[in-house]
Amino acid sequence: MSVVSKGLENVIIKVTNLTFIDGEKGILRYRGYNIEDLVNYGSYEETIYLMLYGKLPTKKELNDLKAKLNEEYEVPQEVLDTIYLMPKEADAIGLLEVGTAALASIDKNFKWKENDKEKAISIIAKMATLVANVYRRKEGNKPRIPEPSDSFAKSFLLASFAREPTTDEINAMDKALILYTDHEVPASTTAALVAASTLSDMYSSLTAALAALKGPLHGGAAEEAFKQFIEIGDPNRVQNWFNDKVVNQKNRLMGFGHRVYKTYDPRAKIFKKLALTLIERNADARRYFEIAQKLEELGIKQFSSKGIYPNTDFYSGIVFYALGFPVYMFTALFALSRTLGWLAHIIEYVEEQHRLIRPRALYVGPEYQEYVSIDKR
């Protein structure tokens, strides 16, 4: 008997060694390592190696990985031209899709199972270039390629803003990249897997993921959560706003609730701490943080009995805003981080358990209808 699972809830489409989630206890692990340990003691580059190769790197392996990233920031001029030909008012994820598709069209010699992991590292570096230049295009600035450095986060921030980032900014960006790296198989990862299952190339699979990420119920949630803080504007208005919008009008509190977690999202706790390291030098970010804190208290009081708590998108926008990024870039920053997770999943699927993903639909329409000519209708 066929069973319809709306939203594919509780449907397992692959086995994985990548990410473990315990939604009841609020546990998230990459390859067996707690997210808290990776954030507190590791780096994004170490996470790249871990996700692709299955273990933490030695010093030599880490240095080799950093060298590879530094070599791969360059993208063909035609790709940058494609982004800059678009109007700066264009949607950031739309621009990123354009750039990613352009790379797919140029890389004509791609073949699966030929240096897949090395190819993934190259793509991760190039995505940093694309995301930085999506921001620069929308701000009306000239193209800029990330400069080689000892930190992926530093190279990305320097390319984006054309200024030397502070230690706190580099640290926050690095940790944000780790936090958004992977989360099993949400909509965007599923979209990437469907594309990769046809043996489409990696770039095209990422384009499919970006299309899914764009939606406000997935990657766009950080933008929507932050827009709430902007709308409230003043910490003293939080209570009235909450009563009006959430309690009376029954609007969804963005940044709250998760399909998997029935407790506080462990990533949200870390993003909240990261925000505290950045807001002291940014009055607006500090004000939005105060609003978020008060909104969190009201939200937990209202919804915790239903297992609804802050998710990763609730505080991440404040971190990105404090780093200097406007709201329109939040989803693109999510994509920069999640590129690693997408690639790790599609490589794992194609190399170890490849099968064309082809689900069925349960037909509930009429059994048979006799065709009636247009003159007799």
Swiss-Prot record:
Protein name in UniProt: Citrate synthase
SUPFAM superfamilies, A to Z: Citrate synthase (SSF48256)
InterPro entries in the cross-refs: 2-MeCitrate/Citrate_synth_II, Cit_synThplmales, Citrate_synth-like_lrg_a-sub, Citrate_synth-like_sm_a-sub, Citrate_synthase, Citrate_synthase_AS, Citrate_synthase_bac-typ, Citrate_synthase_sf
Organism: Saccharolobus solfataricus (strain ATCC 35092 / DSM 1617 / JCM 11322 / P2) (Sulfolobus solfataricus)
A single GO BP: carbohydrate metabolic process
Residues at the catalytic site: H258, D313
EC supergroup of this enzyme: transferase
UniProt similarity note: Belongs to the citrate synthase family.
GO CC annotation terms, alphabetical: cytoplasm
PTM comment: The N-terminus is blocked by acetylation.
